Regions:
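Extracellular beta-strand/beta-solenoid scaffold signature
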Residues: 11-19, 34-38, 42, 62-72, ...
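Short beta->alpha connector loops of Rossmann-like oxidoreductase domains
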Residues: 6, 35, 57
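Right-handed parallel beta-helix/beta-spiral solenoid domain characteristic of secreted/periplasmic
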Residues: 1-13, 29
C-alpha cells in the first residue's frame, strides 16, 4: 500500500489525501494515511472497498478537521478492518446505501466514531468505538442492522455510545 500524508487544509475546501469520484470497484488496501484533512473521500461511487488501512490525523482545529473515511452518495461500500484515530468523524456516510461497515477500530475522534445520515439498508457489525465524543450517530435512516459493536469511554456533554435520531425498520442486537 501507499503512505499518504499532509494534504492541504482549508475551512472552505474539503481537501483529501485520496479523492475518489464517480468510480466503481475501487479497492483501498494496506495504506497509511497521516495528517490529512480528509483521508479518504468517495463521491458518487459504487462497489468500493476500504480494508486494512491505518488512518489518523493530528489536526486539532475543528474548522479544518475532516473525516477519516467520508462517503457521499455511494452504494455497496465495504469498509472493514481499518484502524482509525483522531479525526472529526472516523467513518462518515451520507446518502450511502446497501453497505457493510465491519471489524473497524475507531478511537479519539472529535465527534463520532461512525456517523451516518440518510443512509439505508446498511449493516455495521463487530466494530470497536472508544474515546470518541459519541460512539455512533445514526440519523434519518431505515433498514439498518447494528450487531455486536462495542462503544466505550465516550466523553463530553453528548457522550453517548449510540445516538439514534429517526431510525425505522432496523435491528439493534448484541451491542455493548
Amino acid at each position: 500500500g501507499l503512505q499518504i500524508q499532509h494534504s492541504a487544509r482549508s475551512s472552505r475546501i474539503d481537501y483529501s489525501g485520496l479523492h475518489i469520484e464517480n468510480a466503481r470497484s475501487v479497492i483501498v488496501r494496506h495504506c497509511v494515511f497521516r495528517a490529512n484533512q480528509f483521508s479518504i473521500m468517495f463521491q458518487n461511487s459504487r462497489h468500493c472497498t476500504v480494508i486494512h488501512n491505518n488512518i489518523s490525523s493530528n489536526i486539532v482545529q475543528n474548522a479544518i478537521m475532516g473525516n477519516a473515511i467520508h462517503c457521499w452518495k455511494c452504494d455497496d461500500m465495504h469498509i472493514a478492518e481499518n484502524v482509525i484515530g483522531h479525526n472529526r468523524d472516523g467513518i462518515y456516510l451520507e446518502f450511502v446505501n446497501a453497505s457493510r461497515i465491519e471489524h473497524n477500530k475507531v478511537s479519539g475522534c472529535a465527534r463520532y466514531g461512525l456517523h451516518f445520515m440518510f443512509s439505508h439498508f446498511n449493516v455495521y457489525r463487530a466494530n470497536f468505538f472508544s474515546h470518541n465524543q459519541a460512539g455512533v450517530a445514526v440519523m434519518f435512516a431505515h433498514h439498518v442492522t447494528m450487531l455486536n459493536n462495542v462503544f466505550t469511554l465516550n466523553r463530553g456533554s453528548s457522550s453517548y455510545g449510540l445516538l439514534i435520531k429517526e431510525l425505522q425498520y432496523s435491528t439493534i442486537k448484541g451491542n455493548r
